[in-house]
């Protein structure tokens, strides 16, 4: 059975794992760094250290290849990890670009501060002369999702501020360039006053992998137990899974 490692700064990558599990039966080992979330705004040195901590932990399970289910890590440490471990690492950013290929016109990229400041999506998507990209750092959404305090009023206020430019310019395509954001996709859609293409790269990722296994085995490791991990994991993963919290910090 193929062993696939999937990792993220916290709960967001579970939206990727969920889509993978729907169509690709394999043995999954997911690591969510709920202890050190959010990753947006961290230095590259910190992100390298965090990613090494995670991959070193997952290597104990003889992983065949990895999915970096975090845009922030994808734009900062992908090449570093490939060189260090000599293994296949699939960054969510590459799949996001492929998911955007069938669209053109105006794009709003919602991501963390690190992802937006890298201008990864703007530089790549605007290679198409028919495309214009607007970028908004929506980092506060990650905090609210991970806190899971059900403060819908504050959440709606932040969503409104982040999508204001989309409503003003009637942007046709909104890329969820952080794997946390699909958790509140329905809320984002409701705050828009028009129909837009909401692009979730995780859906495209699941269509891009193949698995010959007949069995699905999901193992989830979180670096810290929080109210959000207790409440959201059962809602995000509707397949049988084994949940483990690390007894010691990384």
Describe each region flagged by the PLM.
Residues 1-250:
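Non-catalytic structural scaffold of enzyme domains
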């Amino acid at each position: 059975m193929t062993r696939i490692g999937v990792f993220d700064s916290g709960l967001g990558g579970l939206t990727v794992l969920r889509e993978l599990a729907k169509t690709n039966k394999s043995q999954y080992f997911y690591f969510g760094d709920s202890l050190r979330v959010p990753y947006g705004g961290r230095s590259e040195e910190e992100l390298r250290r965090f990613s090494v901590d995670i991959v070193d932990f997952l290597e104990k399970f003889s992983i065949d290849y990895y999915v970096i289910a975090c845009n922030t890590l994808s734009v900062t440490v992908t090449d570093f990890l490939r060189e260090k471990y000599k293994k296949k690492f699939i960054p969510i950013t590459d799949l996001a670009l492929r998911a955007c290929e069938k669209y053109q016109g105006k794009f709003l990229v919602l991501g963390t501060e690190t992802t937006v400041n890298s201008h990864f999506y703007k530089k790549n998507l605007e290679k198409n002369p028919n495309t214009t990209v607007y970028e908004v750092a929506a980092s506060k959404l990650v905090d609210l999702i991970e806190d899971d305090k059900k403060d819908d009023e504050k959440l709606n206020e932040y969503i409104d501020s982040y999508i204001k430019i989309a409503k003003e310019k009637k942007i046709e395509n909104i890329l969820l360039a952080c794997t946390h954001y699909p958790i509140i996709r329905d809320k984002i859609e409701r705050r828009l006053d028009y129909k837009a293409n909401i692009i979730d790269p995780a859906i495209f990722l699941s269509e891009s992998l193949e698995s010959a296994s007949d069995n699905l085995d999901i193992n989830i490791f979180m670096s810290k137990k929080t109210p959000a991990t207790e409440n959201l994991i059962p809602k995000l993963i509707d397949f049988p899974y084994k949940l483990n919290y690390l007894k010691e910090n990384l």
